[in-house]
A protein has these predicted regions:
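Conserved ABC transporter NBD signature motif
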Residues: 52-66
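The feature captures the beta-strand-to-loop junction immediately N-terminal to the Walker
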Residues: 33-35
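H-loop/switch region of ABC-family ATPase nucleotide-binding domains
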Residues: 173-175
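Hydrophobic anchor residue at the start of the ABC signature
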Residues: 128
């Protein structure tokens, strides 16, 4: 289990996250939903051990960052490194010395090509493949469906189901409600650095309706064409 207690993060005098309290259990898929700038990426960086913060994060499985696979919104790749070399590097970091990389090339990527030449979607798929090969217990995926084609989205969704069955802890983010509603067991609505609402599956519409509040009044569009 991962337990976040009173997590607060500021950049200078600007508060990004304020008094976050959350719990994540194995075998559950949690979604962090919120508009751009709500603090989702900062929260994920805190969980992944990449940002300092006030408060605490407890994990009963050992050192959290040693068990965590983190997918950033835009994965980073070293220059002149092939897809195969990238995956091997990630495996070596977890002391997985002889990974069967070709067997687990789920997205049929051209692993002999330089990763930096991949499209945005291909790079994201390569990064996800690397996290799976590492055999992580916790998966923190920042906007995993963005920039990926429909068929690959379906594969990612199936991967999430399998990881859930294997009792892994999965935390996703998105600023688009529809990308999370089918994959997640719980949704946490993050707004202006605060968790405004948490809902279990079956009650997600409550969050969707709250997110719609204050959005564009479509009557404005109609009035443009009627004037």
């Amino acid at each position: 289990m991962i337990k976040i207690n009173a997590l607060t993060k500021s950049y200078g005098e600007y508060p990004v996250l304020q008094d976050i309290h959350l719990q994540f259990y194995p075998g559950e898929v949690h979604g962090i939903i919120g508009e751009n700038g709500a603090g989702k990426t900062t929260l994920f960086k805190c969980l992944a051990g990449l940002e300092d913060f006030k408060g605490s994060i407890e994990y009963d499985g050992g050192v959290l960052k040693n068990q965590t696979g983190f997918l950033p919104t835009i994965p980073y790749f070293l220059s002149k490194m092939t897809g195969f070399e990238y995956l091997k590097l990630l495996c070596n970091a977890r002391e997985i010395l002889k990974p069967d990389i070709e067997k687990y090339n789920l997205f049929q990527l051209p692993l002999k090509q330089y990763a930096e030449t991949y499209s945005t979607g291909m790079q994201k798929k390569l990064a996800i493949t690397g996290l799976l090969l590492q055999k992580n217990e916790v998966f923190i995926l920042d906007e995993p469906f963005n920039g990926v084609d429909i068929s690959s989205n379906m594969i990612i969704h199936e991967i999430l189901i399998r990881l859930k069955q294997l009792k892994k802890t999965i935390i996703l983010s998105s600023h688009i409600f529809s990308t999370l509603q089918d994959s997640c067991d719980f949704l946490h609505y993050l707004k202006e650095g605060k968790i405004k609402k948490t809902m279990s599956k079956g009650n997600f519409a409550t969050i969707e309706n709250e997110m719609k509040t204050g959005q564009l009044n479509t009557n404005i569009i109609e009035s443009l064409y009627s004037s």
